[in-house]
Amino acid sequence: PTPIGMEAAGVIEELGAGVTDFKVGDRVAYASRPLGSYSEARVFPTENLVKIPDDISDETAAAIMLKGMTAEYLIRRTYKVSAGQTVLFHAAAGGVGLIACQWLKALGATIIGTVGSNEKAELAKANGCEHTILYKEENFVDIVKDITNGVGVPVVYDSVGKDTALLSLDCLSPLGFLVIFGNSSGNAPPIEPGLLAAKGSLYVTRPTLFNYNDTREKLI
């Protein structure tokens, strides 16, 4: 048996000895271990808590922490997107994708997003995605090359994995980054270093949130 759940929001009811950064009554949220967020009340380390701003509801905070922090480290730290760049984001209508599309749009980037249905295409567009591709029906490599006039994109964010990872390499411009952060279709296949050289001195990384937020300073 094990506790379940790692993302929640709530109100501090009691503080342990030596806690100075929080007070009883503070609204807080977290998306980290130890597991157990499905409980009604629990003891939790304050170094993993974040105060909730007054204009954000508990429900929104609980739902957005993991996805929002994931979007942040992907587009601001793993590969820092700049205004004017065009990026490819797989699963653009997913939880992380919708947040990332809004953020990337605000940064001045152009987003190409793959989606699984026409309904998801409309949702992605409503959240800032300029170009959508039905990746199960269309050749996303050809479409990305067409949109970028054959140049490719500097970064691909891929949470799909097996079905898209190798093809994503063909969407990159020289020195481009493939950021694999999920595996909804299965694990991405092994990639030979020589293939990266042949396709333009490319980079591949497989980041996780917990390495990016493993200290209090990084979290806040």
Question: What label would you give each PLM region?
Answer:
Residues P1-G36:
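Glycine-rich beta-strand-centered segment in the early N-terminal region that forms part
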Residues L15-A17, R33-P34, E47, A92, ...:
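Short, surface-exposed secondary-structure boundary micro-motifs
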Residues A29, L88, P154-Y157, V179:
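N-terminal Rossmann-like NAD(P) cofactor-binding module of classical short-chain dehydrogenase/reductase
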Residues N139-G150:
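Short amphipathic alpha-helix with an adjacent loop that forms part of the alpha/beta core around
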Residues I64-E138:
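Mid-domain Rossmann-like dinucleotide-binding core that forms the NAD(H)/NADP(H) cofactor-binding site
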Residues L107, V115-N118, D163-I220:
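Glycine-rich phosphate-binding loop and adjacent beta-alpha segment
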